[in-house]
Amino acid sequence: MNYIELHNISKTYDKGKVLAVNNISLSVSEGEIFGLIGPDGAGKTSIFRMLTTLIIPDSGSAKVLGYDVVKDFRQIRNEVGYMPGRFSLYPDLSVEENLRFYATMFGTTIEENYHLIRDIYVQIEAFGKRKAGQLSGGMKQKLALCCALIHKPKVLFLDEPTTGIDPVSRKELWEMLRKLKTENICIFVSTPYMDEALQCDRIALIQQGEILSIDSPQAVVGQFDKFIYAVSSDDTYKQLKVLMQYPERLNSYPFGEFAHLVVAGELDEIRLGEFLKNNGLNDIRINRINATIEDCFIDLSRQTKV
């Protein structure tokens, strides 16, 4: 069963001058972790705000749990959990007070649904009397997740939940989401971090308000039909400029300590090495590698511009 459905949704701002979401359609099923993957400004938050009934789409239709996001906003708000990108709990209330407030607001108690938040809450329980505004970034996110889950929602919306928190907290949060999946909760999560795509059952890559691809992370990578080589040398900046002149180059870009060179077919690595050396580069290393989600995103973005 589809818990989330979007049909040709569009959204503009500034009296139609800024197109944030352009004719997007997708669906998310019960018990699925679905990732909306893209950089800042891609349209992720606008989609989340439409689905959580905070803003109205300009055109198209969307349903959450069978309810229309415009006509049935009250029903949707009662049955979903939403964790916005910006910390939005009450900073002057303690951890316990925030949690009890949200439980009361939804007509439930902490005890009734404690099994849903237990694994998360035990990590912040020692700070129960501390004001929420005084928590670390990772602790704030854990508290926000507890508050979003306390009424046992069928759909959980998480807008960039790992932005601004440390790597350990990021790892712990994804482990928590995988446990929640076993409760058949539909989890719709957005992130600018391409590596987090692998944590999802399916993903939608989004750029400038348009969907580039929707599939499982493995299928997205499997559809990459080019060859990628990781290249390094003694001068990273010069190396990028030189690679732009290579005849077989389709694309090249920095990737950590390497440059990724994208070509249509298998390369003669010796010939490439000589080309780089003849252009003043030394300590050259060339390795053919498998595409990552980020490589796929860059390639799909490039195709839409051609």
Predicted regions and their residues:
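ABC transporter nucleotide-binding domain
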Residues: 175-264
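Generic beta-strand hydrophobic packing signal
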Residues: 9, 24, 203, 252, ...
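Long alpha-helical scaffolds
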Residues: 3, 20, 62, 239-242
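Conserved N-terminal strand/loop that marks the beginning of ABC ATPase nucleotide-binding domains
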Residues: 1-9
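Short loop/turn motifs at secondary-structure junctions
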Residues: 5, 79, 152, 199, ...
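Short, charged/small-residue-rich alpha-helical element at the C-terminal edge
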Residues: 228-306
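ABC transporter nucleotide-binding domains
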Residues: 11-189, 194-206, 213
